[in-house]
Amino acid sequence: MRKAKPNAAERIESYLVKLIQERGADKDQPFAVRMLLAFLKFASCLFAAGVAFRYFLYKTGLKRRYPLGIQVISIGNVTAGGTGKTPVTEIFARKLAAEGRKVAILSRGYRRKEAPWWVRLFTQVVTKPLVVSDGKHVLLDSATGGDEPYMLASNLPGVAVVVDRDRVKAGRYAIKRLGCDTLILDDGFQYQKLKHSIEVVLVDATNPFGNGQMLPRGVLREPVRHLKRADIIFITKCRGDVSAVRDEVRKYNKTAEIVECNHTPKALRDVWSREEYPLSWLEGKTTCTLSGIASPKGFENSLRHLGAKVVWCERYADHHRYDSSEILYALNRTADMGADALVTTEKDAVRFPRFETTPVKCLYLRIAIEILSGQESFDQIISRICFRRNREG
């Protein structure tokens, strides 16, 4: 079976991502690429102006921030993709639920199946938010609810997950209909419409701020100086000395608590049966990988650190929605190469169509956050949320 070709939008996206990640001088590029980079730079200036104007509207009160009367913990970043928000969201939700809080995670549900924009335009006011989980049962699949919301709902029994573009509406629904007393705003740093009690910001130690430029010429969603709004900063993917990253962060925020953490493999499971294998199973095994995430190299290197020999890597654009032919192609390619297993990420696994039989094992690697330093600071933040009177910060 031949490999299905990525669509034009994915090819363009992949090319642009590769282009903006390159750190060489623009003058060293071919003329056509220099023209494209100049256009992206111009677009970045427009984007930066739009971001500044938007924050001006909120700061002056011309646009309103809505308090909901309970604790709202925003978890986000200043860059586009790849910092590891989902595991950090999970650790916050799990800890708060264990302390007796009734938690709801609010998400936009990025790249989920939605009605056309003209339908949403006329139905947004009357349409109810989507409840991926009510805290007791997972009610929607990943296509309808979104990859991250479905994954969080599956991993967090007792925690509600609510999806809507309007997170204020989603929050009100979680409070009124689900009885929640604590809200976690997933990817919330840029979402200023809902007033935040605590601002948690993630910084990727392996690539803190990209090339330092705003989208689309760089990866910044807003200026790095906006780190000053953070109450707690998680430096993620810490391997080795990250003092330089810590010092850089301190230039923009002198007072925030800093937590250093790593994304650590915790389990290896069959994609469909959920049968669990010890991580030691990978040692000495020949594997192939399939992923559609923002930072695939980190995932592939994790397998190598666990002792696997990775012989083939198939990468798709972030949040790629797989069809059966793509999965079957990867499985057959893995079998043809004599590899022991096709390994994917947990986020990708929720997007796989189901197969009753496969020519080779298909496993996913479950990742969790391991706090390396700053555990006391994290615990203090949790206590601050749990024992502060229910008021908006």
Predicted regions located by residue number:
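Phosphate-binding/switch loop-helix module in NTP-utilizing enzymes
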Residues: 151-195
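Redox- and metal-dependent alpha/beta enzyme cores, enriched for Fe-S-associated oxidoreductases
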Residues: 266-269, 273-275, 280-324, 379, ...
